[in-house]
Every structure is written in C-alpha cells, then in structure tokens.
Amino acid sequence: MKFAFCLFNYFPYSGLSRDFRRILNECQHRGHEAEVFVRTWQGCQLANTEVTILGDWRDNLSANHDKDKRYYRSLSQKLKENSFDAVVGFNKMPGLDVYYGADFCYIAREQKANHPALRLTPRYQHFFDFEKSVFGTNIQTLILSLSEREKKVFQEYYHTPDSRFSLLPPTLNLVDRKPVQDRSGTDRRIREEFGIAGDALLLLFIGSGFETKGLDRALRALASLPSDLQKRSQLMVIGQDHPGDYQDLAKQLGVGHKVHFLGGRPDIPELLAAGD
C-alpha cells in the first residue's frame, strides 16, 4: 500500500513527532510506501522517505489557524496530483482515512474555559470545523486513540461511534527509558555542567508544548514552596517551545534565577539520573 502521512510540524523532541516516526518506520518495515507532507521540518531528514514541505513565507506572519488552512489547501492539491491508498493524519484536518489521536478535544476545553462569544471568532470556527471533520457522525475516519478518557470526551461532544475508535497502548520506547548505569557519576557531571550544587534539590519539567504541559503551573508551584525548600531548589525545563513568556513569568514570580531552559535534548535518561 501507499500512504500519505500528514503532519503540521515535525521536530525531533516532540512526542507526536516521535510517534509519527515510529509508525512510519513500522509501515516501511512491513513493505509499504509512504510519502510525508509537513508544513515545517526540523532535524535530520528521513532516509528512503520523500518529504514534501508545504510551508509558505506568509506563515511567519500568520496565526496558527491561518497556517493550518493554508497547509491544508496545499496538501489537498498534492493529494489530487498523486494516488494514495490511505491518508493518515497526525493533526485534525478534513479528508483523513486514519487519524492518530494524540490531541485533546478542542471544543471541550474551549467551551469550559472561555466566554461563549469567543465561539464566533475565526480561530474557534477553524479548529471546530477541522475537529468535526474527523469526529463528526457523518465522517468515516478511523481514529487511533491513546486515551479512553479523551475518547469519551470526544464522544460527549461529537457522538462518534465506538466502532471508529481503536485504543492504542502507551507509546513508550523502552530502549530510551533504560536507566543510566553510572547514576552518581552522571548526576555529578550534569550538575557541574549547569552550575548546580550537589546538595541542591533538582526538579525536572520534561515536555515540548509548554502551555499544554502546564509549565506555568510548575513555575507557580516552585514560587510557592516554603522559603527553606525553595532556597535549595532548581528547575530544569527540557522541551522545545518558545520560552520567552515563561522566562518573564519566572522573573515576575521571583524564581527566574532558579529556572534553566535547556531546549529539546536527547539525553533524557541522564537528566533523570541527576534529578530528584
């Protein structure tokens, strides 16, 4: 079979991108073909895989929902020009045969958190339309779901039948999760690299997508610690996102000097060995 794999943004430290790559590799290992369509690509190119980048210069000046619509228009044209047995999406968009559902239900979160008037905005309408194009009752898209809880949330709002969901097990790579052998030596090396005292309490925040993962709450929690505990504490933030607003928040909370933004890194087991 020949698959079209569709993903807005690929970057190596994203959990979604890692899942995308594992599924792509498995399809190829089983003898299938796959062509990849992305808006942006960061990191090393994939061997033996055609990757088409559909980004536009206007994306740098656009809101996310406008970027998504522009990507989808370009993707639709590419899909018309080529013949695929199945279109597999890792973000919500129309026209998918299979959707890998790693994301939360947009309208559930928005309707609980924001004023009803915001439902009239172009942003809300776009994300609702794209979500409905996957989960609507008149759609045939098959959904690979990572969470029984989130599946029920989608069904509450879209009444999607059970028959369209397949629940997947946790996507943990056991090779990457093996503990380091020399924990004490690794601990010492990591702390020396970042100038963190050996008796400091080292806290770790690991995850790309700081808003979704709740980095603001982690910073507020650090700032709320009892003074004697806070004095000993340092926080490492490991993940790929725009840190500016969170660096500002850390400074406003008086803990800016205690927070280290490391960006995305491949040495998570080593960092875990150093953390408390």
Summary of predicted features, one role per range:
Residues N60-V87, Q125-S133:
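An amphipathic, basic-hydrophobic alpha-helix
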Residues P122-D187:
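Donor nucleotide-sugar binding/catalytic pocket of nucleotide-sugar-dependent glycosyltransferases
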Residues W41, I206-F210, R232-Q247:
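Glycosyltransferase donor-sugar binding loop
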Residues S17-R22, L201, F205-S224, G244-D245:
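A conserved mid-protein helix/loop that constitutes part of the nucleotide-sugar donor-binding site
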Residues L7-Y13, E26-A63, K78, E150, ...:
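N-terminal strand-loop element at the rim of the active site
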Residues A273-D276:
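Acidic donor-binding loop of glycosyltransferase active sites
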Residues Y246-R265:
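Nucleotide-activated donor-binding/catalytic signature segment of Leloir-type glycosyltransferases, i.e.
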Residues M1, Q181-L202, S227-D228:
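Nucleotide-sugar donor-binding and catalytic loop/hinge architecture
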